[in-house]
Design a protein with these regions (language model features):
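Helix-rich, typically C-terminal accessory recognition domains appended to large enzymatic cores
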Residues: 97, 162-176, 428-459, 514, ...
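Conserved oxyanion/phosphate-binding beta-strand-loop segments in alpha/beta enzyme cores
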Residues: 12-54, 84-93, 117-124, 228, ...
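Alpha-helical recognition segments enriched in aromatics with Gly/Pro capping
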Residues: 324-330, 334-347, 376, 494-631
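Amphipathic alpha-helical
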Residues: 213, 218-242, 278-320, 465-497, ...
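N-terminal catalytic cores of NTP/NDP-binding nucleotidyl/phosphoryl-transfer enzymes
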Residues: 42-112, 118, 141-156, 179, ...
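Catalytic alpha/beta core of large soluble enzyme barrels
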Residues: 76, 89, 281-380, 385, ...
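Basic, alpha-helical terminal appendages of large translation-related enzymes
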Residues: 2-48, 278-281, 290-293, 371-381, ...
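Residue patterns forming the tRNA-binding/recognition surfaces of aminoacyl-tRNA synthetases
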Residues: 2-11, 18, 26-27, 31-39, ...
Length: 822
């Protein structure tokens, strides 16, 4: 990166020429390599308290890093270095989320085996990440494709299997025709594959599932423990989707079976004039009569070809009458049973009771198919004649509801589940929208699922002592599209012996999703060479859990939810002693190209950091990444903006070079500016207002330059304070300034400075003097001047303009003097 010069030449260059980012950054990279600044103990040997700051580790994409990726890494490093200055030992690791669809799709596109392309991509991105000059501890590095890492990913799965949390199920799943694999609900966005954007369809497949629903209540209630953005907590709460209601049993006319529905409004049961089943409901086909069978079977087939999102979209509802009836358990009325694809088999019971008078969707359906509409809630008890839309107001009194007539609906809503349960018609129930996690993928590039299928013993886990079950090397790794993983074609790997009975058996050929390793990787960083346990209790106690997690909000209901689930499970089995992975979360916004368009190679708007580092230096780019806008919001990139930041660093450098040999004592103005500088940068850093921290440096530097013009130079303590404050943002130049000012050792051993509010106060302030609201003069007065003295001095300043009668004299402290005349 730098110049081939001696240390003596280097020192001479630094002291006598303008800001030279190449020489400075080369010098301090080498110095940090020899003398690391992030130490577990202080100079006296006292152990430092840890602070674990974590980035969401990257997919090793073939496109490398662009300036948008840099933003998150710079934010985390600024925070890490700030905590280092506060005296913490910083746990700040980095690794690679290298299994899964992104890596495999890139390998297929390039015609290279994913093991080769992934290794090449890791090497390139690691080089780019090192250009950031972050505090990453590469001794902690992990890679999800390393067998010594995924041994423990498989170990977690085996533990879940033994605890009954991992199970097999055959059912229609989300299927991406392009990626040729199943997808979890969380990986489908607006009906499209989260990775490639292809329309998602349905495919009936045998799948491995994780029973995340067992943790639904804890995942929801424990959100209150977390110092996370409210937006993310709400997204998770909505995804978990807790609701209170009742399961109600509807007997089927002429049959012994009952259809159980889940409803959050059991108070409206008298108004249920029909019911709708999901086409996949286990009774759907058998409910068809001879007259309806052909139409029912066609409808079931058509529904199976649609994604859940397509089925739930707000468009015209479709349906088919089965020909069968249920009996409303409260009033004994016959209730026609319909099928419609807007009801999903995996929510509730896969069947709903429909109250068209009080639900827009049910009203639309009933109107279309000529089904009776019975109003059971009315405002002031008055029934609506000729309803043209559903009455969906929450408040009202019950009508047409037998013994419930006259009751307030809000009261009955709470009581009805218990009334229904007491009468043996159903059960009071809590329900969740959260579904079990579809965990298997029909791809090659993923962790093999450590299960053996035995004809006699069934599904048997690979013994823990035999882990890792290594992914076999293959020539053909492209997805088959048949619902079988490419591993299914490797007979010598598939065929094995049952670990229990020793008879011939077959290995599971599906692999784990890309989320498997990322759900727990943050634990492995701190004990990544331990081959005996996932993480030792000693290391866990010393460095876990994560104090600050920084990454994009796009993972709110994927990685962040899965990580919480994994952490709670590992806590339950005693592997760790905490049940939430990340104390604090910060979501940075995206850096976009022109007109707010997401950066991508296909759009040709990717900005590589490499050239900017070469031309302006790492420090300038780091500061500009923060300066582009509030870190939590998206920001549009403009290369021209880096000039302003670079200009600030040059002006600061020149100020230091002009002052470092001057024998200047701190004036009141210097001391005041020093304390204001500390206050502004500290408060802005603490509030994560990093863009205003950068502008704060510029503002205060300009003020110091003005003071230097008057006093000849700036005192060393003020400039040293500037270096310490700047060190998290621009570490190279901060180190160099610190050394140029005569300090020994690293600036990162200095400790974060404090401020004194008294020292920040002005001795004198300028106050405008107004007559009838118009400014006539500006005077300098003591900051603590009394009202009487301020008005007296103000009147003196405008004495020649006081030509009328004074009716009022106003002094707003430190703001304004106003004399009202007539």
């Amino acid at each position: 990166m730098g110049l081939n010069i001696s240390k003596e030449q280097e020192e001479r260059i630094m002291s006598n020429v303008p800001y030279n980012h190449k020489a400075i950054e080369k010098k301090w990279r080498e110095r940090w390599e020899q003398n690391p600044v992030n130490l577990k103990a202080d100079e006296k040997g006292n152990k430092r308290e840890k602070y674990y700051c974590l980035d969401m580790f990257p997919y090793p994409s073939g496109n490398g890093l662009h300036v948008g990726h840099w933003r998150g890494y710079v934010i985390s490093d600024v925070w890490s270095r700030y905590k280092l200055q506060q005296g913490y030992y910083i746990v700040h690791p980095m690794g690679w989320d290298a299994f899964g669809l992104p890596a495999e799709n890139y390998a297929i596109k390039m015609g290279v085996h994913p093991a080769i392309s992934t290794a090449e991509n890791v090497k390139n991105i690691k080089r780019q990440i090192n250009e950031i000059a972050a505090l990453y501890d590469w001794d902690m590095e992990v890679n999800t494709t390393d067998p010594e890492f995924y041994k423990w990913t498989q170990w977690i799965f085996v533990k879940m299997f033994k605890e009954g949390l991992a199970y097999e199920k055959e059912f229609p799943i989300n299927w991406c025709p392009s990626c040729k694999t199943g997808l979890a609900n969380e990986e489908v966005v607006n009906g499209k594959c989260e990775r490639c954007g292809t329309e998602v369809t349905k495919k009936n497949l045998r799948q491995w599932m994780l029973r995340i629903t067992k943790y639904a209540e804890r995942l929801l209630s424990d959100l209150d423990k977390l110092d996370w953005p409210e937006k993310v907590k709400k997204m998770q709460a909505d995804w978990i989707g807790k609701s209170y209601g009742a399961e109600v049993d509807f007997p089927i006319e002429g049959r012994e079976e009952k259809i159980t529905v889940y409803t959050t409004r059991p108070d409206t049961l008298y108004g249920a004039t029909f019911m709708v089943l999901a086409p996949e409901h286990e009774l759907s086909k058998s409910l068809a009569t001879d007259e309806t069978r052909e139409a029912v079977e066609k409808y079931i087939y058509d529904a199976s070809m649609k994604s859940n999102v397509d089925r739930m979209q707000d468009k015209e509802k479709t349906g088919v009458f089965t020909g069968s009836y249920a009996i409303n358990p409260l009033n004994g009325e016959k209730t026609p049973i319909w099928l419609s694809d807007y009801v999903l088999a995996d929510y509730g019971t896969g069947a709903i009771m429909c109250v068209p008078a009080h639900d827009d969707r049910d009203f639309e359906f009933a109107t279309k198919f000529g089904i009776p509409i019975v109003q059971v809630i009315a405002k002031d008890g008055k029934e609506i004649e000729n309803m043209t839309e559903a009455y969906t107001e929450a408040a009202g009194n019950m009508i047409n509801s037998g013994e419930w007539n006259g009751m307030e609906s809000a009261v009955l809503k709470k009581e009805a589940p218990h009334i229904i349960e007491k009468r043996g018609l159903g059960r009071a129930t809590v329900n969740y929208k959260l579904r079990d996690w579809v965990f298997s993928r029909q791809r090659y590039w993923g962790e093999p699922i450590p299960i053996v299928h035995c004809p006699d013993c069934g599904a048997v886990p690979v013994p823990e002592e035999e882990l890792p079950l290594r992914l076999p090397e293959v020539e053909s790794y492209e997805p088959t599209g048949t619902g079988e993983s490419p591993l299914a074609g490797i007979d010598e790997w598939v065929n094995c012996k049952c670990p229990v009975c020793g008879k011939p058996a077959k290995r599971e050929t599906n692999t784990m999703p890309q989320w498997a390793g990322s759900s727990w990787y943050f634990l492995r960083y701190v004990d990544n060479h331990n081959d005996k346990e996932l993480v030792s209790r000693e290391k866990a106690d010393e460095m876990l859990p994560v104090d600050m997690y920084i990454g994009g909000v796009e993972h709110a209901v994927l990685h962040l939810l899965y990580s919480r689930f994994y952490t709670k499970f590992l806590y339950d089995i005693g592997a760790i002693d905490f049940d939430e992975p990340f104390h604090k979360l910060f979501n940075q916004g995206m850096i976009t190209g022109k007109n707010g368009i997401k950066m991508s190679k296909s759009k040709g708007n990717v900005v590589s950091p490499d050239d900017l580092v070469r031309d302006y230096g790492c420090d300038s780019l780091r500061m500009y990444e923060l300066f582009v806008g509030p870190p939590e919001l998206d920001a549009e990139w403009d290369d021209r903006g880096i000039d302003g930041v670079n200009r600030f660093l040059k002006r600061l450098w020149n100020l230091v070079m002009d002052s470092k040999d001057a024998d200047v004592k701190a004036t009141k103005d210097m001391i005041k500016e020093r304390h204001r500088l500390v206050y502004d940068i500290t408060t802005r850093l603490e509030s994560f207002s990093l863009n205003t921290a950068i502008s704060g440096f510029m503002e205060h530097n300009n003020k110091l330059i003005e003071i230097a013009k008057k006093e000849g130079a700036i005192d060393k303590e003020t400039l040293s304070t500037m270096a310490v404050l700047l060190s998290p943002f621009a570490p190279h130049i901060a180190e160099e300034i610190w050394e140029q000012l005569g300090h020994e050792g690293s600036v990162f051993a200095a400790g974060w400075p404090t401020y004194d509010m008294e020292a920040m106060k002005d001795d004198e302030i300028e106050v405008p003097v107004q007559i009838n609201g118009k400014t006539r003069a500006v005077i300098s007065v003591a900051a603590d001047i009394s009202k009487e003295d301020a008005i007296a001095e103000g009147k003196e300043a405008v004495a020649d303009k006081l030509t009328g009668t004074i009716v009022k004299e106003i002094y707003v402290p430190k703001k304004i003097i106003n004399i009202v005349m007539k």
